[in-house]
Amino acid sequence: MKKIFLMRHSIPEKGDMPNERIPLSEKGKALAVSKRNILSKVDRCFSSPYRRAIETAECIADHPVIVEELHERTIGDAREDFWLKQYEDYDFRNPGGESLNQVKVRMKTAIDSIVGQMEEGETALVVSHATAICAYLLSYCEIEVKDAVDKVRKISFHGKEILNGRFQPADGFELLFENDAFSDICIMN
């Protein structure tokens, strides 16, 4: 059995800068550090190349490996109703952006590669982004939008409710892999 903690980055700074360069806020750093106890026994750590994800990973583990494919979904030229539309049609994308299906394939390729690098019995932390993580989970889970304005989702796996609410900063999922195949998921506690 192999285990991955698939975690959303912590709370970012607010400001006007390129998405990939946004750092963690002081509150975000403190929240990430508070996750150390839960994640103290990880054998490996991987991160999106975005600064807020790297900083989250570095608050928890030493020397995270940067995996380009773990980056957030490219939004492109966003429209007002974009967030809901992407869940109504997984192939929907803004001009210049990625669809959830495109992100799902990219994320699944990255995580399958990470699982393939792990030894039996190892645990890894993977820090990424809310939409990228939810897109990956579409490979195995059902995702239902409960409230598009507040970005409330219900995520289920084989009829078992995993999350019913907002996917908060520094929250995540515990994924289990048997013979390198996805076998179970629960919320990260």
Regions found by a protein language model. Give the residues of each.
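Active-site-proximal alpha-helix that buttresses catalytic centers in soluble enzyme cores
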Residues: K2-V65, E98-N101, P169
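Short beta-strand scaffold positions
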Residues: S47-S48, V105, V127-S128
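Acidic, low-complexity terminal tails and accessory targeting/binding regions
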Residues: R73-F82, E88-D89, E120, L138-N189
